[in-house]
């Protein structure tokens, strides 16, 4: 079958038009940051879902929203305020759930609703509603070079961690008590997962928004678990599904 030259020319024109989009810097940054955040969220999401911390992304994103509202009201740099606040919140959730006095889902709901309420109160008293909408629903225009650098660093750390400490993460994810008995420092690896999750949430809020960032953690992992049964296969499939879906 011979393809008509006009058909080839039309296809080439469409390809050129698609590539011309990336001449805009903000679109290129949005694509790179989105793919890297999707990759990080998918890899971390497998462990979080299996450890029954599926809603930690939603909880930390609401904490980040509250921190961003306060930073905007005080005219402070958003990332410099939100990153340490979300990291501390992740450690608090990890500590509360490990004590066993409050279940993990209850702790997430408590912290999430409180932070969201604080953010709403702060916004109502300031004139930063426009900026806050970009954090609630995401905005590709809000991606800066700092976000790009942070997303690259975060993705490299996550990938290296999964490659080097795959067996220990596997043990901590499925049976934390057994991993402690075998000498694995489960607290250290849980802390690392919490730290990386907090960084991923903060960066992802810029492009996905506080209301949708948790979907990058939950949906790819759950979809992969319907297809594969091994931890390695689920992790790889989750990363592919997340990047393609974005």
Regions found by a protein language model. Name each.
Residues 18-25, 39-50, 67-77, 168-178, ...:
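Short juxtamembrane and helix-loop transition motifs at transmembrane-helix boundaries
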Residues 24-29, 108-167:
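Transmembrane helix-bundle core of multi-pass membrane transporters
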Residues 31-36, 79-84, 109-110, 148-153, ...:
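Hydrophobic alpha-helical transmembrane segments
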Residues 46-128, 224-237:
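Short loop segments and helix-boundary regions at transmembrane helix junctions
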Residues 148-217:
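Helix-loop-helix "hairpin" substructures at the membrane interface of multi-pass membrane proteins
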Residues 213-246:
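Transmembrane alpha-helical segments in multi-pass inner-membrane proteins
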């Amino acid at each position: 079958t011979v393809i008509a030259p006009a058909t080839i020319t039309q296809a080439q024109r469409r390809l050129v038009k698609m590539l011309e989009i990336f001449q805009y810097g903000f679109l290129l940054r949005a694509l790179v940051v989105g793919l890297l955040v999707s990759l990080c969220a998918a890899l971390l999401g497998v462990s979080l879902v299996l450890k029954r911390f599926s809603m930690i992304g939603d909880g930390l994103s609401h904490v980040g929203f509250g921190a961003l509202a306060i930073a905007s009201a005080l005219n402070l740099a958003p990332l410099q305020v939100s990153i340490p606040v979300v990291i501390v919140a992740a450690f608090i959730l990890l500590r509360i759930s490990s004590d066993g006095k409050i279940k993990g889902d209850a702790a997430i709901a408590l912290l999430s609703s409180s932070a969201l309420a604080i953010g709403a109160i702060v916004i109502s008293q300031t004139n930063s509603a426009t900026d806050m909408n970009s954090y609630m629903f995401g905005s590709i225009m809000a991606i800066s070079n700092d976000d790009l650098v942070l997303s690259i660093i975060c993705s490299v750390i996550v990938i290296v961690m999964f490659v080097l400490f795959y067996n220990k993460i596997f043990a901590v994810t499925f049976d934390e008590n057994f991993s402690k008995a075998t000498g694995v420092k489960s607290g250290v690896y849980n802390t690392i997962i919490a730290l990386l999750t907090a960084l991923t949430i903060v960066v992802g809020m810029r492009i996905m928004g506080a209301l949708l960032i948790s979907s990058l953690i939950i949906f790819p992992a759950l979809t992969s678990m319907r297809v594969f049964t091994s931890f390695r296969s689920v992790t790889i499939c989750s990363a592919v599904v997340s990047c393609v879906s974005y």
